[in-house]
Amino acid sequence: MKLTRILTIGACAAIALTGLNSQTAFAAEKEHAEHKEKTVVPESVDGIMDAIHKAHGDLADVVKSKKLADVHHHAFAIRVLANGLPAKVAADKKARVEGSAKNIAKLAEDLDKTGDANDQAATEANLKKLDGVLKALDAQVK
């Protein structure tokens, strides 16, 4: 009888903890999704690139000031903007710009993870990688 009671309590605790983790993950995803909806993609390539550079500057400031909890807002804004570029560039540039947009999306995820983990060194390293990809993107859209 005692063993059954202990197993029942253990199972209930496991279910409760699983529910808490799911709610926490859902809340984090919802927060990231809400920010994505707020990013407005300009109509022109120049407008998108200006917005990317502004968000990149904001991201660099956030990382420099060690406010890593805010990294994902700026990283995901850059991702949304970069994903809007392939449809706006000339056909001969589209494939390369799509490749850069994929790299930016991966780096945005990496920045989010390292920022959420409060890992300053890894976040700075990912920001440096993003700097290089954005430099290449600048050359691709010209």
Describe the residue ranges of each PLM region.
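C-terminal amphipathic alpha-helix
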Residues: 30, 38-46, 58, 107-142
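Bacterial Sec-dependent N-terminal signal peptides
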Residues: 1-10
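Short, solvent-exposed, charged loop/turn and helix-capping segments
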Residues: 81-100
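Short, charged, amphipathic alpha-helical segments
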Residues: 71-76, 95-105, 121-132
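Short, flexible helix-adjacent loops and helix caps
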Residues: 60-68, 87-90, 116-120, 142
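Immediate post-signal-peptide N-terminus of mature secreted/exported proteins
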Residues: 27-74
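Amphipathic, heptad-repeat alpha-helical segments
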Residues: 68-87
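C-terminal segment of classical bacterial N-terminal signal peptides
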Residues: 15-25
